[in-house]
Amino acid sequence: MDGMDELIYKEVAAALRSSINQLPPANRVAAAGFDEAAMDRLITIASAYGTPTIYCTYEFAVKMIPHEAWRYTEAMKNELWNNGRLATYKGTKVIILEQGFEDETNTRKVIDPGYAWVIPTGADGKPVKIAFEGGTIVDEFNNYDRSREIQVYKKVGVVCMLANNICAYVDTSLLGQMYTWNYDGVTGKVITYDGRLDGTV
């Protein structure tokens, strides 16, 4: 049943993406790159309902750093050097959503790195609802070549109900970058930092 956990994780990520339009316009921001003032505004909105926490992927978190170098303390420099990101953003805790891959080739990610969610703790209810229905059905089949095949079926549903206490930040420069190493699925090559197709995977 390990695959069930991965499936639910994938369904939760898809449900969060598709439900972003439930949020009021003031609660969502789309920008190319990280806009410090916009994130501060979202944190202010979410903090009206509780202590805000930022949920994002590692790729998003490494961009959430102050732009002015004079704001870096020695502790921040050490944390950036050791972890590649800050554990808190202006006092707001940053939780990293674990990134997974769709299969054993490690080329396509499960979670879109372009999204960050600001969710207040202590708010009423949880934004994601997961429901299981019925028992687990296990069927075993004997194939013509005498091999056995086992199929497992479990009915599950995932829905997001976002209220006005939740905020979303969309980094359009990361949005949709689901392939690792900027892998080009058509040519089978890797896109380099300057846009060239180079090498094979």
Where are these regions (language model features)?
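Alpha-helical scaffold segments that mediate packing/assembly in large oligomeric complexes
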Residues: 1-47
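A sequence-level detector of short, solvent-exposed, charge-rich linear segments
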Residues: 15, 19-23, 27, 61, ...
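Long, positively charged binding patches that form subdomain-scale interaction surfaces
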Residues: 27-106
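Sequence/fold signature of self-assembling virion shell proteins
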Residues: 71-201
